[in-house]
A protein has these predicted regions:
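A charged, solvent-exposed segment within the mature domains of Sec-exported extracytoplasmic proteins
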Residues: 38-105
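Acidic, serine/threonine-rich low-complexity disordered tracts
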Residues: 1-46, 93-224
């Protein structure tokens, strides 16, 4: 059903560094096939956090001219935005993250709602369920910055919805939280995205800056 209503395939990849309680993205790639539209978007970040955009086929100039250089600087991509580093026992939820996806500039604000133990789906497990995870549940609010929100179906749902929830679980010895479940109410009922498989590797040192790297490969499923 979800595929019939939103016929699209998204392949997203993000590379970057964990620096304290933030992520410093280095590269983001989005390979999208939606209906008759195919597009490859790449964002490459310099040392000052300024992204350089490459798009094939190119966007129309009118689609991206409103997002200024100042608005793009020190933002995160749509994948690294959901990797939430923490110190000690701090909650990952109390933060607002500025995001630029190559076309739109928007904020995501997370707020702590509670804790919950969940068992995500695992297609490789005999019973179809993975091990239980202790998660922190956050609400999420979407705020369009530039360009002003347009009447696109998905962004309209995001803008009008203050009941979106994300379940974050601790990884990397509790120093970073990753989303394992995402729920958004829609006119057809709740759309649920769950983590099916996760492979993570880390590098203890990247040189003098003493920042650590986390490379994550994940598979998710969406259902209504």
């Amino acid at each position: 059903l979800a595929h019939r209503l939103y016929p699209a395939v998204y392949k997203l990849m993000s590379m970057g560094r964990i620096a304290g309680e933030s992520i410093e993205p280095e590269k983001f790639v989005s390979d999208t096939v939606a209906r008759d539209d195919k597009r490859l978007v790449t964002l490459t970040y310099d040392d000052m956090g300024m992204p350089s955009l490459s798009v094939t086929p190119p966007y129309d100039e009118d689609d991206i001219k409103e997002v200024t250089a100042d608005q793009q600087r020190a933002t995160q991509d749509p994948v690294s935005a959901f990797l939430l580093p923490v110190r000690a026992t701090d909650t990952p939820c109390a933060r607002t993250i500025p995001i630029f996806d190559g076309k739109r500039r928007f904020n995501l604000t997370f707020a702590h709602q509670g804790t919950k133990k969940i068992a995500p789906h695992d297609t490789s497990a005999p019973d179809g369920w993975g091990p239980s995870l202790d998660t922190i549940v956050c609400t999420m609010h979407y705020e369009a910055i530039t360009p002003p929100a347009k009447k696109r179906r998905f962004t309209t749902v995001l803008r009008r919805n203050d009941e979106m929830k994300i379940w974050f679980a601790p990884f990397n010895d509790g120093r970073v939280y990753l989303p394992v479940r995402f729920e958004i109410p829609t006119p057809l009922g709740a759309a649920v995205m769950e983590l099916n498989d996760l492979t993570a590797t880390k590098s203890a040192s990247l040189g003098r800056d003493e920042k650590s790297a986390l490379v994550v490969s994940a598979q998710e499923s969406t259902r209504f």
